[in-house]
Amino acid sequence: MGNAAAKKDTEQETVNEFLAKARGDFLYRWGNPAQNTASSDQFERLKTLGTGSYGRVMLVRHRETGNHYAMKILDKQKVVRLKQVEHTLNEKRILQAINFPFLVKLQFSFKDNSNLYLVMEYVPGGEMFSHLRRVGRFSEPQACFYAAQVVLAFQYLHSLDLIHRDLKPENLLIDQQGYLQVTDFGFAKRVKGRTWTLCGTPEYLAPEI
């Protein structure tokens, strides 16, 4: 019993040390956001992966390295017209500052006269939503496997005072090893305390709301 308690305390200390270091790294990047780390002509556009109300996501290839990425292209005029400027700037600033295995990573960002570009790692497995719809339901071990990754990702985010605010199967991507990547930080925000804004996806709201 004593050994088990001591082991648990040691594991918690390791987690706390990791989160403390991660917070320091995040705060540095948060306070020193990267600007224009690439340009459009460095990428070859291959195909459209998805479209949204004010932009689209394309599969691109980096001409120099040959690496594939997902490029989110946001139309500036539509962002302004739909009053999404704050959300867009928040998304970019958060993505360039976070670093965790189960969160999608921003590799490059830049802009031109018409668009904002967020270039993220390409996650080839697609959305969890598609997999879940195909199989009907996950087994209990699968569900626990995925849930553990979501819990760890959100423990990391919440330790940085970040809230995602749009967790759903469509925003969970599955990589080539079968692990999750939380994506779409369009509603994400850094706050201390409560927020009073109703946001997210209506179909996933708690019934009592």
From Swiss-Prot:
Residues where ATP binds: 49-57, 72
First-tier enzyme category under EC: transferase
EC numbers: 2.7.11.11
Keyword ATP-binding attributed: yes
Activity regulation, short description: Activated by cAMP.
Keywords of the record: ATP-binding, cAMP, Kinase, Lipoprotein, Myristate, Nucleotide-binding, Phosphoprotein, Serine/threonine-protein kinase, Transferase
Residue ranges of domain Protein kinase in the record: 43-209
Cellular component GO terms held in the UniProt record: cAMP-dependent protein kinase complex; cytosol; nucleus
Modification Phosphothreonine, positions: 197
Reaction equation(s) it catalyzes: L-seryl-[protein] + ATP = O-phospho-L-seryl-[protein] + ADP + H(+); L-threonyl-[protein] + ATP = O-phospho-L-threonyl-[protein] + ADP + H(+)
SMART domains xrefs: S_TKc (SM00220)
PROSITE patterns according to UniProt: PROTEIN_KINASE_ATP, PROTEIN_KINASE_DOM, PROTEIN_KINASE_ST
GO molecular function: ATP binding; cAMP-dependent protein kinase activity; protein kinase A regulatory subunit binding; protein serine kinase activity
Description of how the protein assembles with itself and partners: A number of inactive tetrameric holoenzymes are produced by the combination of homo- or heterodimers of the different regulatory subunits associated with two catalytic subunits. cAMP causes the dissociation of the inactive holoenzyme into a dimer of regulatory subunits bound to four cAMP and two free monomeric catalytic subunits.
Protein family per UniProt: Belongs to the protein kinase superfamily. AGC Ser/Thr protein kinase family. cAMP subfamily.
Stated name of the protein: cAMP-dependent protein kinase catalytic subunit gamma
Species assigned in the record: Macaca mulatta (Rhesus macaque)
Lineage of the organism: Eukaryota, Metazoa, Chordata, Craniata, Vertebrata
Gene: PRKACG
